[in-house]
Structure formats: C-alpha cells, structure tokens
Amino acid sequence: SFVGPTLIKRQELLELTIVSLPGIFQNFIEKKYEVRIALWEDDYASCKISPNSGAYGFDWRIWPKEEFCVELFLPTDNLIFLCRKMLKSLNLNFGVFDFIMGKDNNLYFLEVNPAGSYLFLELYFPECKVFQKTINFLLNGNNVDENVSVDKFYVE
C-alpha cells in the first residue's frame, strides 16, 4: 500500500535507533504549489498542482481529486535546459521532475523519477498529448512521428 511523505521533527530523527532505512529525508518547505515536468529528450509536458484548501496536508497524491487544482505550467527555457542536463548526466532519456514553488518564490528541486506518474496530465489537458508523445518516443526514440495514432493502442 502507498505510504506518502511523513513530517518528522529533527529531534525525532535523532532519537531513532534504526541502523538502515530505505527513505529520503528532506527539509520541509512551505509551498505555494508543486510543479511536475515530464521530459523526453526533445519534448516536455508540465503542470502546476495546488491545493484548494489546506485541509489535506502536504501530499496531493492522497487528496480527493476535488481538493486540488491542476493547471498548465510554462517552465523557463533555463529550467528545461537544466532538467535535460540532469537527464543526460544520469544517462536517462526520459524523466519526471518534481519541484516545489516555495512561499519565498524560489523553485526547489525534489526528485527526478524515470518511471514517474505523468499520464494524468492528458486527463486535465488533452492538448498536451502525453499519450501520443510517449508512444511516439517508445516506437521511434527521438524521431517523433506525428502521424502515429494513439487509437490503435487502446483496448475496447
């Protein structure tokens, strides 16, 4: 089952007696919203995810759908450049990047996941064509063919 992020105070962390733990520990950042960027070598799709209220904590993945808002997000050219540079340095040709826009108006990198969730973007923004981009990339690598039909991959 899914276990989302948990807020731990520094003192609690110091008191733990666990020798090894499969976890990632990051400082808590007060956020305005989250940014998710699905990045192929030659293309990307991105969104901004914001809470409609503060009632559900800090992980939108466990909120009821009506409690968050998904909007298009236009990253800067420099941000896309840096993401591509990271993909190249990790020898990846695809990755899903997560960022937080802090209340201090700084953008904070959280992670890049080579198998991250991004297909939901098409549910909110069909014009993003992430299914099309993914299928083209899987079939053609960098040689994107706009004529490949997504329809032939749907099961009735």
Language-model features, listed with the residues they occupy:
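Homeobox/homeodomain signature
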Residues: 15-19, 84, 97
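Anionic group-transfer/hydrolysis microenvironments
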Residues: 28-29, 38, 98-100, 113-115
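Short loop/turn microsegments at loop-to-beta-strand junctions
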Residues: 34-35, 95-97
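A short catalytic or substrate-binding loop motif that flags glycine-/basic-rich loops and adjacent residues
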Residues: 28-31, 89-93
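Protein kinase-like catalytic core scaffold
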Residues: 24, 45, 95, 108-111
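Phosphate-binding site of ATP-dependent enzymes
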Residues: 1-74
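C-terminal active-site "lid" helix and adjoining low-complexity regulatory extension at the edge
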Residues: 69, 73-77, 81, 85-92, ...
